[in-house]
Amino acid sequence: KKYNYNIQVGDVITGIIFSKEKQGYLVDIGTPIAAYLPKEEISIFIQKQTDIEVNLAQEFFILAQDLQKNTIILSTKRLLYIRSWTRIRQLNTEDIVIQAKITGINKGGLLVELENIQGFIPKSHLCYITKVDTLLNTTIMCKCLIANEQSNQLILSNRAAVLEKYLHKLKVGTIVDSTVIALKSYGAFVSIYNIPALLHISEIEVNKTNNFIIGQIIAVQIIHIDIKQGRLSVSRRYLKK
């Protein structure tokens, strides 16, 4: 029995794939005409299957319809996209630490996948990692920085996640041991729990960095914590000689 549903573009509807065509699939959604699921609108998860299961009920997104031409176009890719962004918005709102899969590495940072959406961790938001190339296809802890569904922009921070993990040990005024990881004209970068921290030249007791060497362990005092950006600033000016 067929039902004359009053369907609209943007609706989510249950249907059953009943026939494989050259460029897609025919789907029974209870309307007098069969709906069509083009191959390019099939979600990534289903594409990974060698054969799409027929006669299995599942949900579809109404992508387009033209009743004069008797066509209803469906999408599972769009449905997955909408639901993925709903979960990402929730993760962003709750500001929780999450695990993302690393899918690519470039000079600017890491490409990751979170809830089937591609995201990016800029190099400036990565903790100190010596062998970045070994990270491909592993997971990395991070927090959302920018989550914009309209522009499909997902920017994440590994530093912010690691900083939150060790926040109970890192307070303004705390003196900790750190490792020198880079020397710059404006100061030095040190690693604290693998979180890069800036030791500005004005915060060094003799206003110069040439008495430091890479790998040296030095005591520093935390003077600023930016939890959202995952940044630390440290000083040696107030340490007892």
Model regions: which residues?
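Single-stranded RNA-binding regions, centering on S1/OB-family and related RNA-binding modules
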Residues: 1-241
